[in-house]
């Protein structure tokens, strides 16, 4: 039956009491209607925090994704397009993904002042934080655990540590994170993820 409200079997094709001329007037007036009006959705709730890696609330995530860029984003047609990554691809049918980060992307503070260049190490640091049980107590780790090689093992490893030991961990070259997790940064603007499955 779809959205028409009709059952699809029999029934009237015109609303009761409308003749053909009344319908023609209705069609003419509808051509003058506004068809591309956009009304933004505003949240009436406060954002709990600005750490996009930690948030557990949908309304937080909606707001934060408007002010944070990822490697890729989705265009209005639902296609992946460049954001911080200027190019990306795989050479082994999806087991390994390489992202080339655009040079000149800056981290800015709340006032819009440039603080630092965004580079591949920033993504490694972010992933280490998400996968570190003691640093990220929100437990929002399902996607990286299910997708990235060694992510679940690293998460379980950090669980076995004291809070102090876990907080001392980093994502720097030669770290336990780099040893265990399928992420490489061969240079400042190249990021490689090794996945569990295609």
Language-model segments: what does each one mean?
Residues 90-93, 185-187:
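Residue-level recognition of beta-strand termini and adjacent short loop/turns
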Residues 16-42:
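N-terminal low-complexity, Pro/Thr/Ser-rich intrinsically disordered segments
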Residues 33-46, 96-100, 123-126, 191-192:
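Short, well-ordered beta-strand elements
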Residues 3-15:
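Bacterial lipoprotein signal-peptidase II cleavage site
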């Amino acid at each position: 039956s779809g959205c028409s409200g009709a059952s699809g079997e029999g029934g009237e094709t015109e609303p009761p009491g409308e003749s053909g001329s009344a319908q023609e007037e209705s069609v003419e007036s509808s051509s003058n209607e506004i068809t591309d009006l956009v009304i933004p959705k505003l949240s009436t709730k406060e954002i709990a925090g600005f750490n996009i890696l930690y948030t557990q609330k949908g309304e937080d995530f909606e707001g934060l994704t408007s002010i944070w860029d990822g490697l890729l984003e989705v265009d209005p047609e639902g296609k992946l397009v460049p954001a911080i990554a200027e190019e990306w691809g795989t050479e082994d049918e999806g087991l390994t993904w390489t992202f080339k980060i655009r040079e000149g992307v800056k981290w800015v503070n709340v006032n819009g002042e440039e603080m630092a260049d965004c580079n591949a190490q920033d993504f490694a640091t972010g992933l280490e934080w998400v996968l570190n049980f003691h640093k990220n107590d929100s437990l929002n780790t399902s996607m990286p655990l299910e997708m990235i090689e060694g992510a679940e093992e690293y998460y379980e490893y950090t669980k076995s540590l004291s809070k102090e030991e876990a907080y001392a961990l980093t994502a720097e070259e030669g770290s336990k994170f780099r040893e265990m997790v399928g992420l490489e940064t061969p240079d400042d603007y190249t990021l490689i993820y090794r996945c569990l499955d295609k």
